Structure formats: structure tokens, C-alpha cells
């Protein structure tokens, strides 16, 4: 424990209410003190006894950054804190840009096949981004969720209450985890060690995860009554054992252990006493405290739904704290109607199933169903006379994507049972024959695709925006940027990457041949950064867009031959031979993504880039989950990681590339085959019968023959 801090001295009687800069009250030991000015020259004047208070408000006082707990090591004057937050290395923003990319089921298959036949290029932006999204998609599709019939039956679920050894599941201090041992089965010393003291319970009740102390007192009174009732029940059972009604039986509870005289440890033999020391595998647990194991299961059988819901409302936080409920359960303040009394929900069935046969039931579905002859037929492949091993295997990628797409668009799986009416139901059966017949619960599609299997592009080249009507939380086809940037870098990243490049890949920033649907892979990039010869690429290693400058061939050949030999015989280039001050000056002109790549060249360059981390880099906190022996968990900062972001240089405007027109490519495009029609073809009007003459009142009188006049 640290030393107790001395409380600040009390203000003098006059100084406590004096705010006059020109105070001339004489100095007295218990009345007033000397008037001084701030030693940092901020302009404030005050009594000497108020100097400690002024340090809390002085704008020139050196204070740590507001994000010092998140890794920022800088200290500055208090009036510079607000301006520093814009460039603080610990003020990190995560990009939440989202887009949708659907799988390619039956459209543009020729284009995708021809693209994968060519050598992958980093200048083909839409293809590189689609391949990266495909990798993310394959790592997120779990096979068991799409095909539950293929679950491995021999897989064992992790059970903390099973045969796990207590030594392997130690607590925070290396002891036995109290969650694995029944309270009634432990010795008296173990029970005393496992039970929490009153101070520990008060501390848990005051934490954010627990409830307040007032409700904790109500819980204690309720649990003390339950404890007294269990003691009374045990004493009655002991008196019955003495009368001879019950002999040779032993009752165990979480708080009281009762035995008859014949079963006591003093009268037992050495073998029986040795067996009594062993901990049984299963033992009945009682008690309704939130920290007791199995309390929710006992409540479901002991009380009705109304009392069970009220117990969850009042004791929800402690149940989460002791691991009885998952952490995603809403807290008490999240319940809008938490103060209202819960009511049991009863389902009323208005449709009554008839108990007798009704002949008109067949007319609901098909009127001729009764007249048609019926026969027994197999619904499987047994009538084909082919064994299951000889049947062709299903395409793993296409079948998985098709089933995931059906669940995404239709809201249900392909094979789903559908009820016709109150009596009949269509039981759908859809099975697939994959190469691996069974999958574990954690198997994803990417785990089944080995290096020997040829890859392909199975998603669309163009992406779509996420709308409000799309359920992106459960969608497997929604992708997120998830890149971290400093607060001053995020607007530039969003404008240059997402607004200028990614949203314009389909026809504006990048233009494909109009005959791409036939399989033509020709593509043009229309824009480049202004003032320099560079091109936009997509780096698969960094998983982001970048600007790559174009180096002249004569400069690249000169760089290969321009090497110096060091004292130890190692080859050194001309850049390494420069002084450290010059190297640091040159590195100051590079963008963040260039600094991150330069730091991986050598140890010297890494040390040069490390000097720019506080000015250009960012710090991220690496969190680690810590589990305690009493069942509670908390997240602690495990490490601080310094790195550069993936932001490239700021681009305010773009310039057109010097590329030829697309019409020039169409002249030599191998898919632009002119089809000349030489045979005469009837027009549409010639294929129909000629229309009748238009009938009118005038034509009617003209067609009437003229009679004789008398």
C-alpha cells in the first residue's frame, strides 16, 4: 500500500474569499498570507495558499495528453491540449466504409475465367480488390451453418464441468478454479477459501459490472433466509436419522453437510475414510445466489415464468459478472419497461386440429388427389443402382456460395420445411456429396481449399453500396474497410480511396472493354496523380490502394550498378552512405505508407523511421482478456503498438492519362467479330397478315349499291 497523502492545508480566513489582485491586507499567520504571481507568468495573481489550486487551472502548466492512458507520451501546456488532439498519435479512427459484393453464379463466367488465366497485375484494380474480398468471404463462411447435416458427430464440445483437470484450469493466482468444484463436495478449508468475504462482496457490488449496495443488502437478506431454511431442513433430517427412519444415507448441500452416526468419519474404516476424501464427479447443488452454479436451471423448475423474469431483471448484472449468463445480455438500464411487473406470455391456438377423419380435407390441396392411383417410390438415388462413392462430388465453392446467397436473398436455406396447412407439412431434403464428408464446427470454406486446388474468381468485379434495407449484421457478403488512421489522416483516406477510386472503378476511374461480357480482359486506367508520373495500384500485401511512381529505365539500371562495398565486404547503396541527419530529412517528405515500407528495408532505415513515429505514426492498444478464479473477466491493455498507417500522399485533383481511345482497341479486339448477314430476312411487318381496310361511315355508304329511282 502507498503512503497516505497529506490533505492540502486549509485556506486562511481572509484568503478563502479574497479575489482582489491588489489586496494589501497585512500578513497574519491565521488570517491572510502573501499575494504572489504565477511562476509560469500566465498573468494570474493570488494568495500563496491558493497556489496548489491554481496549478489545476493554469493554462501554462505542463500536463500529459488526454490520451496518455491510450499510449500518447507527450506533455504540453494546458491551453494546447485541444489543438493537439487533431494530431495526437493515440487519437485513432477506424474506417467503417462498407460495401456489398455478390457471388458470381452464372453471369460473366467467360470474363472471370480469362482473367484468372492471365498473370495477376496490381494495376487491375477491380480484380485485385475482388480477390481480396473473396479471401475474406471464404474465411467467414462456416460449413456447419450452411450444411448442418455434415457436422462431425464425434466432435466433443468444450465442457468446463466435465473431466477437465483442476490443475490445468487454474485461476488468476494458479490455484484451483472454483467453478469446477461443487461447493458441498469441498472440505471445510476449501469452502472458506472459495467463499467471498463481506468486503469482497461489497467491492463487487460497487463495481460497474455489479449492482448498487442497496439492492445487495436486499439480496443478502433473501439469501440468509434461504440459508436458514436449509439449516432447518437439515436439522429435521438429522432428527429423523436418530429415530431410525432413515439409516445409512447422507445429505449434501452447498452450505450444510449432514450425516448419521454410523456414517461418521470416526467410525469408518481406513478404506471408507479414504473414499470419502475423494471429490465426487456430480453432486446436487442448491441455493438461489447469483454466484452459485446452476442457479438458472433450478429457478426454471422451482418458480414460474413471472418470478423467473423478475429475477433476471434484478440480478442480471451479478449473473453476468459470475459467468451465469452471456455478456451480451442487456443491462438493467437498457430495459425500457424494467420497473413494470413481468407477465407470463401465453400462446393461444385458435386453430383446433380435428380428431376425426373429414373427407373434405383432400379438396383443400388437390380435388383429383383421391382419384389418382398411388404407389411407393424411393426419393433417394438407390433406384439408380449406383453406389454413393461413384456419384460425382459437388463443387465445394459453387455449392457453398449458392446456399449462402439463397439464405442472404430469400431469408432461408435452399432446403427448408414448409407447412401446407394445419395438418400437412412438406419435409424438404437436400443433401450434397462433398469430398470431405464431415466438418467440424470451426471449419470454414478457406480451410478446405488447398494449394493444389486451382483458384478462381467466384465473386462479381463490381461492388454495391450498403443500403438501409440490407441486414448487414448477419450478411456474409458485406465487407468493411477496417483500416486505422490518425484523426487528421482519415478525411484524406476516405476522399482519395473510397470516394475517388473505389466508387469509380466501374467505368469511370477504370474502363473495361465493352465486349468484356464475351471474355475480353482489356482494361484502361484513365486517371493519375497530378504533377508526377505515377500510377494507382492495389497491394495484396498491404490490402489497400497505393501510389507507385514510374521510374525511368535508365535510372533503374544505374541504381543496380551503383553499389558501394563496406568494410565488412557487404554491399551498400549510395542512400545508406548518407549521414543520419540527411536521411532523417529525406524521410520527412515521405507519406505514411512509404514510411511503413521503408522501415522494413534495414535496421538503419527502421531506426530512421522510428524518430518520426510520434509526429507521423499512431499508437494502438493491444487488449487481452484476463479471467479470474471467481469467474469474472476483464480486459487489460497488454501492449502498445506503434506503426504507420496506409495513407498515401494527398491528391486534390486527378489528371487524365495519355491512353488511346477505346475505339482503337475495338479495331483489334479478338472478340469484336463482325457478323455479316447475306441472306434476306423478312421484316416484322411482312411476317404478319395485311391489315384490313379501315372501316368508316363514309366507306360504308360508298360500298352500298345504288338503287333505281322512280
From Swiss-Prot:
Entry annotated with the keyword Zinc-finger: yes
The protein's name: F-box only protein 40
Compartments (UniProt record): Cytoplasm
Zinc finger (TRAF-type): 53-114
An example molecular function term from Gene Ontology annotations: ubiquitin protein ligase activity
Subunit note: Directly interacts with SKP1 and CUL1.
Gene name linked to the record: Fbxo40
The keyword Mitochondrion is assigned to this record: no
UniProtKB keywords: Cytoplasm, Metal-binding, Ubl conjugation pathway, Zinc, Zinc-finger
Tissue: Expressed only in heart and skeletal muscle.
Amino acid at each position: 500500500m502507498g503512503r497516505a497523502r497529506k490533505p492540502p492545508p486549509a485556506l486562511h480566513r481572509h484568503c478563502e474569499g479574497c479575489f482582489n489582485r491588489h489586496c494589501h491586507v497585512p500578513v497574519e499567520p491565521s488570517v491572510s498570507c502573501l499575494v504572489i504571481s504565477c511562476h509560469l507568468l500566465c498573468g494570474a495573481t493570488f494568495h500563496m495558499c491558493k497556489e496548489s489550486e491554481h496549478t489545476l487551472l493554469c493554462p501554462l502548466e505542463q500536463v500529459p495528453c488526454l490520451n496518455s492512458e491510450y499510449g500518447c507520451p507527450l506533455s504540453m501546456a494546458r491551453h494546447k491540449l485541444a489543438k493537439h488532439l487533431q494530431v495526437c498519435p493515440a487519437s485513432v479512427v477506424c474506417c467503417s466504409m462498407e460495401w456489398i459484393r455478390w457471388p458470381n453464379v452464372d453471369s460473366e463466367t467467360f470474363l472471370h475465367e480469362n482473367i484468372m488465366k492471365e498473370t495477376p497485375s496490381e494495376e487491375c484494380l477491380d480484380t485485385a480488390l475482388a480477390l481480396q474480398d473473396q479471401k475474406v468471404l471464404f474465411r467467414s463462411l462456416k460449413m456447419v451453418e450452411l450444411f448442418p447435416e455434415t457436422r462431425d458427430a464425434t466432435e466433443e464440445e468444450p465442457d468446463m464441468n466435465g473431466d477437465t483437470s483442476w490443475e490445468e484450469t487454474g485461476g488468476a493466482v494458479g490455484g484451483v478454479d472454483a467453478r469446477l468444484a461443487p461447493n458441498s463436495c469441498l472440505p471445510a478449508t476449501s469452502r472458506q477459501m472459495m467463499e467471498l468475504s463481506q468486503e469482497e462482496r461489497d467491492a463487487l457490488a460497487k463495481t460497474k459490472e455489479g449492482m448498487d449496495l442497496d439492492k445487495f443488502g436486499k439480496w443478502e437478506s433473501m439469501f440468509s433466509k434461504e440459508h436458514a431454511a436449509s439449516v432447518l431442513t437439515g436439522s429435521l433430517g438429522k432428527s429423523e436419522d436418530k429415530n431410525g427412519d432413515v439409516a445409512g444415507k447422507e445429505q449434501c448441500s452447498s452450505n450444510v453437510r449432514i450425516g448419521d452416526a454410523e456414517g461418521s468419519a470416526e467410525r469408518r474404516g481406513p478404506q471408507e475414510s479414504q473414499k470419502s476424501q475423494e471429490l465426487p464427479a456430480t453432486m446436487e447443488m442448491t441455493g438461489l445466489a447469483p454466484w452459485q452454479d446452476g442457479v438458472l436451471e433450478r429457478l426454471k423448475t422451482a418458480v414460474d415464468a413471472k418470478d423467473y423474469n423478475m429475477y433476471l431483471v434484478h440480478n442480471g448484472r451479478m449473473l453476468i459478472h459470475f459467468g451465469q449468463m452471456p455478456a451480451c445480455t442487456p443491462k438493467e438500464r437498457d430495459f425500457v419497461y424494467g420497473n413494470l411487473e413481468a407477465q407470463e406470455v401465453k400462446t393461444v391456438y385458435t386453430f383446433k386440429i380435428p380428431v376425426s377423419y373429414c373427407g373434405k380435407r383432400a379438396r383443400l390441396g388437390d380435388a383429383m388427389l383421391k382419384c389418382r392411383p398411388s404407389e411407393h417410390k424411393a426419393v433417394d438415388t438407390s433406384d439408380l443402382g449406383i453406389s454413393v462413392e461413384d456419384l460425382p462430388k459437388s463443387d465445394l465453392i459453387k455449392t457453398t456460395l449458392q446456399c449462402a446467397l439463397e439464405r442472404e436473398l430469400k431469408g432461408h436455406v435452399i432446403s427448408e420445411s414448409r407447412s401446407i396447412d394445419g395438418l400437412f407439412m412438406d419435409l424438404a431434403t437436400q443433401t450434397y456429396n462433398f469430398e470431405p464428408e464431415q466438418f467440424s464446427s470451426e471449419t470454414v470454406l478457406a480451410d478446405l481449399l488447398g494449394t493444389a486446388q486451382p483458384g478462381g474468381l467466384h465473386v462479381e468485379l463490381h461492388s454495391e453500396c450498403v443500403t438501409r434495407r440490407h441486414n448487414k449484421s448477419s450478411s456474409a457478403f458485406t465487407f468493411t474497410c477496417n483500416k486505422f488512421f490518425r484523426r487528421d489522416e482519415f478525411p484524406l483516406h476516405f476522399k482519395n480511396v473510397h470516394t475517388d477510386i473505389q466508387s469509380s472503378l466501374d467505368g469511370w476511374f477504370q474502363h473495361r472493354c465493352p465486349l468484356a461480357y464475351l471474355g475480353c480482359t482489356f482494361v484502361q486506367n484513365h486517371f493519375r496523380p497530378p504533377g508526377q508520373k505515377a500510377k494507382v495500384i492495389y497491394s495484396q500485401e498491404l490490402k489497400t490502394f497505393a501510389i507507385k511512381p514510374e521510374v525511368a529505365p535508365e535510372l533503374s539500371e544505374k541504381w543496380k550498378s551503383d553499389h558501394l562495398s563496406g568494410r565488412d565486404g557487404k554491399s551498400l547503396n549510395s542512400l545508406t552512405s548518407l549521414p543520419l541527419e540527411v536521411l532523417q530529412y529525406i524521410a520527412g517528405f515521405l507519406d505514411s505508407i512509404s514510411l511503413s515500407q521503408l522501415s522494413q528495408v534495414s535496421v538503419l532505415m527502421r531506426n530512421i523511421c522510428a524518430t518520426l513515429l510520434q509526429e507521423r505514426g499512431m499508437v494502438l492498444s493491444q487488449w487481452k482478456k484476463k479471467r479470474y478464479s471467481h469467474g469474472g473477466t476483464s480486459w487489460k491493455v497488454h501492449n502498445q503498438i506503434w506503426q504507420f498507417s496506409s495513407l498515401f500522399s494527398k491528391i486534390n485533383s486527378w489528371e487524365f492519362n495519355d491512353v488511346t481511345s477505346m475505339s482503337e482497341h475495338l479495331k483489334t479486339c479478338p472478340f469484336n467479330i463482325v457478323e455479316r448477314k447475306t441472306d434476306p430476312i423478312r421484316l416484322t411487318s411482312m411476317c404478319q397478315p395485311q391489315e384490313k381496310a379501315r372501316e368508316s361511315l363514309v366507306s360504308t355508304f360508298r360500298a352500298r349499291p345504288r338503287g333505281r329511282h322512280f
